[in-house]
Amino acid sequence: MTPDPPIRLRRYAPPDEAPTIELWRRSWQQTYPSIDFSARVAWWQERWRQELLASATVTVAEGAEGIVGFVTVDTATGYLDQIVVAPESWGRGIAEALLAEARRQSPRGLDLHVNIDNHRAIRFYQKHGFCTVGDELNPISGRPVHRMSWRP
C-alpha cells in the first residue's frame, strides 16, 4: 500500500521534538481513550530525550500537513520501540512505510513489545510477519505485553 498524498521519510531533527511528542500523545490517546496521556507528556518527553534519542534512530514521516508519523529503532539491537501515526492518517500506508524503513535500518530482524489489548497494532505486526515469542509485564505501566519478533 502506498500512502497518498505522498509522504517523505527523513531523519529526525531537533526542531521535530514538539510535533513528535504531540503526535505521540494524540495517537496513544486515540488508542486508549480512558487514559489521560496529557498527564504523561512530561514523562514521555524525558524518556524521549534521555532514552530514545540517545539509543535509537528516529525517522519521521512528513506530509503536506507536517509530521504524520515516526518510528524509533535501536539499530544496534534491532529493538523497535515506537511506530506512531497520526490518527487521522491511519490506513494511508504510513505505518507500512515506517516499518519498511525500520527493516532497512535493521535488516537482521526487529523485536518489539506491544500491549496485549492493542489489537490493531498486533494485527498490523502479524500481517507484516511478526510472531509472538513471549508475554511479560511492562515494567513501567504494569500492563501485559507480547514480545514480538520479525526475522527475514
What residue ranges belong to the model's regions?
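Acetyl-CoA-dependent GNAT
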Residues: 11-88, 99-101, 105
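Conserved N-terminal entry element of GNAT/NAT acetyltransferase domains
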Residues: 1-15, 150
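Conserved GNAT acetyl-CoA-binding A-motif
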Residues: 105-117
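Conserved active-site alpha-helix within GNAT-family acetyltransferase domains
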Residues: 92, 96-97, 117-134, 140-144
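Short hydrophobic/aromatic beta-strand or adjacent loop that forms the aromatic wall/cage
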Residues: 56, 143-148
